[in-house]
Amino acid sequence: MRFLRFLKIFFTVIRFGLDEMMLSRVNDRRVRLLLRITTIGRKFDAPPGVRLRLALESLGPIFVKFGQVLSTRRDLLPVDIANELAKLQDQVPPFDSAVAIGLVEKSLGAPVDVLFDDFERVPVASASIAQVHFATVKAGQHAGKAVAVKVLRPNMLPVIDSDLALLRDIAVWAERLWADGKRLKPREVVAEFDKYLHDELDLMREAANGSQLRRNFAGLDLLLVPEMYWEFCTPTVLVMERMVGVPISQVETLRAAGVDIPKLAREGVEIFFTQVFRDGFFHADMHPGNIQVSLDPAHFGRYIALDFGIIGALSDFDKNYLAQNFLAFFKRDYHRVATLHLESGWVPPTTRVEELESAIRAVCEPYFDRALKDISLGQVLMRLFSTSRRFNVEIQPQLVLLQKTMLNVEGLGRSLDPELDLWKTAKPYLERWMNEQIGLRGWYERLKIEAPQWSKTLPQLPRLIHHALAERHDHTRGANDEMIRQILLEQKRTNRLLQGLLLFGVAVGVGAALARVFLALAYGG
């Protein structure tokens, strides 16, 4: 079966001329000769990126997902290919509703008619991983609640594991034979995709992500996140509050309903930067299909977030790196940007800061020919990542995910309001975060976090030091026995010498005193 799948991939490569794309970049002469033979008499009008996208679409949903993940790695791919892969969409027909109902009943341990009223047989959404049905909870504390029931596609894991095994094999060969193999790190990309895909297959993880995001925005009049109904959540079924809104892409519908579109654009950016710099936890799949706007009078004009399968997380170090890079960029302090890259530890220590600064200046300076409102922070990050390739910078996956999400947010914001000044909206968040981290308040907050641990550790410190020294002594005792013996011998010799000198000194002193007495008696002095 795996061999047949491999054959299909091979013939798809030939059909769409992907072998021709690889021809000039293959190291092995024999493979290059074979590829030349296969390309004789063939001509392709479509650009390479289009052919790659069509090939992935023909190979099915797993390869479509792989292409989508690959499109976010703009630090590795040429811009034209990354842009083309970004067009890949999950266009998968729904699976049989009877199968979906069977999966829900098996997962939740009760018939659908006992759990829900009005379980809609026709799904409202279908993708490569799962599909969604609307229903109403029948009994219990959530009785009467309108819900969305997300059901994982059946028998996904064997198919995914089989395709991932093939992708791993292809990655190994690509790294060996392709001139760009080591730079593009195909095995690392496949490993990242493996983790991403298996995370999406666990709906409990998605429910936890949604619950965290909801808690983060509780009390803020910015974002609506559906409540998760945990008694109905399992790794294969997720039941959450049903949210009704208008997709963000339907701008004219929103305008006709009276939504303040420029305000909506600004709030979208505020939501994103709140997630990034306040929470370090952000929705990383913010394309128009997952973002809606409520027209409910109680929440009119507020964003609704859906689908929490892909979430990014940033450490304080990551946030500091981003904030300082953006602030230095807008001050045109390219030396600081280069230094930040070196201080991150992601750049080889042999890199000359002046060379990196020069490359960054060449990338960034052209942006300042345009108005600040026309500068794309996502594009700046993307260009910086691309430049970093030349210096073998290890770009962290969470920052690449952030950059891809930032491009989505910017595109969404400017589709709503072409005059949106992203920098003006973002700058207060960056400066506030920097002040909170570096200022007295930041020091106080860190002290509050660390103080309980210090109060626990400090009384134990003498014992811990004694224990560590004793362990070190025991560990090194055998190796140092000879040295200790020599030191003791030397100490004994030194002691004998000191004793001799002391006795000699005493004798001299006593002798001198006796001599003075004798002379006094003899001469009557």
UniProtKB/Swiss-Prot annotation:
User: Which parts of the sequence bind ATP?
Assistant: 124-132, 150
GO terms (molecular function) for this protein are: ATP binding; protein kinase activity
- Please report a single Pfam family linked to this protein: ABC1
Source species, domain of life? Bacteria
Active site as annotated: 285 (proton acceptor)
Q: List the subcellular locations.
A: Cell inner membrane
Print the keywords alphabetically. Answer: ATP-binding, Cell inner membrane, Cell membrane, Kinase, Membrane, Nucleotide-binding, Transferase, Transmembrane, Transmembrane helix, Ubiquinone biosynthesis
Its protein name is Probable protein kinase UbiB
Species assigned in the record: Paraburkholderia xenovorans (strain LB400)
Lineage, uppermost ranks: Bacteria, Pseudomonadati, Pseudomonadota, Betaproteobacteria, Burkholderiales
- Give me the gene this protein comes from: ubiB
